[in-house]
Amino acid sequence: MSDTSPNYHTLQSIGWPWPGPPEDPAWQAIFAAHPQALPARVVEQHRTGYVVADTPEASLKAESLPEWQRPRFPSHERAAVGDWVLMEGKRIVALLPRRTSIKRGAAGEHYHQQVIAANIDTVFIVCGLDADFNPRRIERYLLLVGGGGAEPVVVLTKADQTEYAEDALAVLEELEAQNIALRAVNAKDPESVAALRPWLGDGRTAVLVGSSGAGKSTLTNTLLGTQKMKTNAVRENDSRGRHTTTHRALIPLPSGACLIDTPGMRELKPTGEEDLAEGGFSDVEALAAQCRFNDCAHIAEPGCAVRAAIEADQLDPERVANYMKLRVEVASAAEKLATRVAQNNRGKGSGKRPASVDRPGRR
C-alpha cells in the first residue's frame, strides 16, 4: 500500500473509474474531508474484517469504521467487496458512494439489505446445463440485478456435459429477445470461455453469482489460467455442489479486468427497490399495461393482455407465474423498506443515522 500519494495508474488496474483524481463531486467532497487519506479497494470481505488493495499485488488487512461494529448498524451501509474506501494507515476512514451494486434482501424475518458486490460493470449469472438448470432462479437473479446499474449476462456452464444445451437456450429465448446477453460455455475450456471477453476488458469489474456447483470457481480458474480457486465435484443425482467459495473476493485477471467470485446463495429475496421491467420482465410489464383493468391479476379477468399472450403461445405460463410471485415479493419488501426509511429519517433528524452510500447508475 502506498503511504504518500495516490497512484491512479495502478488504481486503474483494479477498477478505478477515472484516469486521475475522482470526477464525481460527492467523491471529491469526501476526499476533501480526509486530506491525509488514500483510496483503496475492498478485495476481500470476511466475518472478522476486510482486506483492501491499491495495486493488484499489494493488499493489507484493514480496520473498519467503529460504527460498523455495532450489531444494529445496517449491513448494506458497511463496505462490501468492490467498494472504494479511504484509508489512513490501516484504518478505513470513509466509504465512497457506490456507482453500481447488486443487493438482496437478507435472510430472516426483519428487513435488511445485503450488498453482494459494489462498483461492478457486469453480473455474470452462472447456471449449469445439468440438473442445476433453473430458468426461474435465473429470472430471480435478473430481478436483483435490474436497476442496480450493472449489465446482466446469463452464463450457462457445463455445455460439454449435456445434450440439452439447445433446449435450454430455447427456454431463454424470451430473455435474449429483451437484449439480455446469453452465453453457453464449457467452464474448463479457455477457447469456450473466450466468449466472455467482451465484458472483461481492461479496467472493468465483473461479479459471478449463482448456486453452489454451477461452475463459478472453475470459470474463475479458467479465466485466470491457474488453479487459484478450490473446486469441488457435484453430486450426480441432483447436481448440487458444496460451497467451494467461502467468502467474496476480488481477483485481478490477466485481461486487465477484475473478477469477484461469490459463494452460492440459497436465498434470493428482493429488497423492494427492484423494477420488474428492468429485471427481465419488460415484455410482461408491457402487456400488463394493455390489460383492461389497472389492477388486473392476470388470472381470469376479461380483457387481460397477459392471458391472451399465454393462450397464443407467446408467453411461457411458468414464467408468468414466476413474474406474479416476484411482483408480490417486491411489493411486500417495498412496504418494509418504506417503513425502514421512515424510521431512519426520524433517526437522522436526531443525528443517529448516517446517509446511504448507494447511488446506483451506469458507469
Curated annotation (Swiss-Prot):
Keywords (A to Z) from UniProt: Cytoplasm, GTP-binding, Hydrolase, Metal-binding, Nucleotide-binding, Ribosome biogenesis, RNA-binding, rRNA-binding, Zinc
Textual note on the cofactor: Binds 1 zinc ion per subunit.
Disulfide-bond pairs as recorded: none
Chain positions covered by the region annotation Disordered: 340-363
Gene3D superfamilies linked: P-loop containing nucleotide triphosphate hydrolases, Probable gtpase engc, domain 3
Enzyme class: hydrolase
GO MF annotation list: GTP binding; GTPase activity; metal ion binding; rRNA binding
Gene name of the record: rsgA
Domain CP-type G: start-end pairs: 112-268
GO biological process entries: ribosomal small subunit biogenesis
Coarse class of the protein's main subcellular location: cytoplasm
Domain of life (superkingdom): Bacteria
Binding residues for GTP: T157, K158, A159, D160, G210, S211, S212, G213, A214, G215, K216, S217, T218
Necessary cofactors: Zn(2+)
Entry annotated with the keyword Membrane: no
NCBIfam families: ribosome small subunit-dependent GTPase A
UniProt cross-references to PANTHER family, sorted A to Z: SMALL RIBOSOMAL SUBUNIT BIOGENESIS GTPASE RSGA
Keyword Cytoplasm tagged: yes
Self-association and partners: Monomer. Associates with 30S ribosomal subunit, binds 16S rRNA.
PROSITE patterns to which the protein is assigned, alphabetical: ENGC_GTPASE, G_CP
GO cellular component term of the entry, any: cytoplasm
Protein name per its UniProtKB record: Small ribosomal subunit biogenesis GTPase RsgA
Protein's cellular compartments: Cytoplasm
Residues the record lists as binding Zn(2+): C291, C296, H298, C304
Record-listed E.C. numbers: 3.6.1.-
Family of this protein: Belongs to the TRAFAC class YlqF/YawG GTPase family. RsgA subfamily.
Role according to the record: One of several proteins that assist in the late maturation steps of the functional core of the 30S ribosomal subunit. Helps release RbfA from mature subunits. May play a role in the assembly of ribosomal proteins into the subunit. Circularly permuted GTPase that catalyzes slow GTP hydrolysis, GTPase activity is stimulated by the 30S ribosomal subunit.
